[in-house]
Amino acid sequence: MCIRDREDYLSTPASNAVWSLGYGSASLQTGDELDGKHYVGGSLSFPKSKAATAIYDDQRVRVIAINDGSGRGTLIFAVIDGFGISSTDVRGIRKELADFAKANNIVGINISVLHQHSCVDTFGMNGDLVKMIFTNPALNRINNTFGTDYKLLNGQNASFMKHLYDVTVDSVKEAVNSMTTGKMYYSEIEAGEYIRDKREPMVFDSKIHRFRFVPDNGTKETWLCNMAIHAVGNGAAGTEITGDYPYYIEQEVNKAGANFIQIQGAELAISSKHDSLNLPEGTPRLESLKIYGTTLGKLIVESNEAETEVAPLLNYRMKEYYVPVTNQILEFAGKLGALTNTVVATDDSNNVLEVATELGYLEIGTKLAVAIIPGELEPAIAYGGYLDADHSWTGTDFDYPSLQDIVGTDKELLVFGLMNDQIGYILEDNDYSSILSGVNEEIVATGNLAGSTTINAFEELMKSIH
């Protein structure tokens, strides 16, 4: 499963291979979310911070442990309800699981978010910016002068994050300890009437990709659903805590007797579309996101799309890479200490910053490939269809292959986005506009080189495998 060199790669299942899968889940909530010290992630807020004022439903972590029976180890996928999680916290959780991983031959621990704009801030950018602006520079000077390690202020609540670490670790262990053999089935459910793209070139995946694991022992099934839809049903500026539409998909899947886990796809500017729901005018946002999630849940549960059995085969490899920070807003946030990402200076005067992050490649069975991406990917980078010089912001072409081109035509490409880091929007270089344009995607992107840098790193990774 974990490809350390070309000899580890399997093109067909090992002899006597069989799927094994386990599931774990827990609430991230502590009961203290309304104490005025828990901020809601989703948008920068200045000068007033976004302290949580109400709890509408739950904020959870969901985990699967999966093994292809080849003897090459077990993979973990943990998905957190939250706006983002940085590589710093991903590595922190991995560190707490190090002994358990070694004892159980876990070869990869992947942690992502569903990117709700309405959960307690797990990323750090949505705290009290006024306090950060005035306090963190002084703390930086003290740390640099005296060699101290005072923690800089950000939007994370320390107690909440400790609880998040604890229950995520426990849920990983629960998933591993509950692994059982079974069969895996895959189907594609058309959901285009519920999805819209807000940005040219209007390329997006309209499918819900469902993996249905059926245990041999007759216990509860586990359904993994991969789809690309922003979870921003309550807007980006609200102060109510909600798990948004994924929470209500889960309610329907649970009613059908199955466990549920969702992984976001390439959802850069992909959002929900409510036209076919026929909602009365003035329907409150919290009610509309509930109806939207329930509708998607019923669509998934009631689907009669043909399923194919997935051969028990996983090939998996990760690669670290560095993304230049050319966005002045994020550069300022990095120097301020508001970013929890691993940001490194690559010059002596600390003026050139890069985010150290990781991407990966996964094969599930013999016909499906997955790009594991550390941010919110423009779908055209995954599937092709870039804007040409006549239609792009810079007036130039973007002469790069898509990730599907790099993978080849013999496998369908899926995207597991926001995985192991949140580096923001990953756009084509030729369509990254000025942050003064007011385009939201540019404000929360590392800059104008994220697209080409990510494509190059993915291509290098694929060359190391094949």
Segments and roles (model prediction):
Residues 4-291, 297, 304-466:
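Conserved beta-alpha junction segments in alpha/beta enzyme cores
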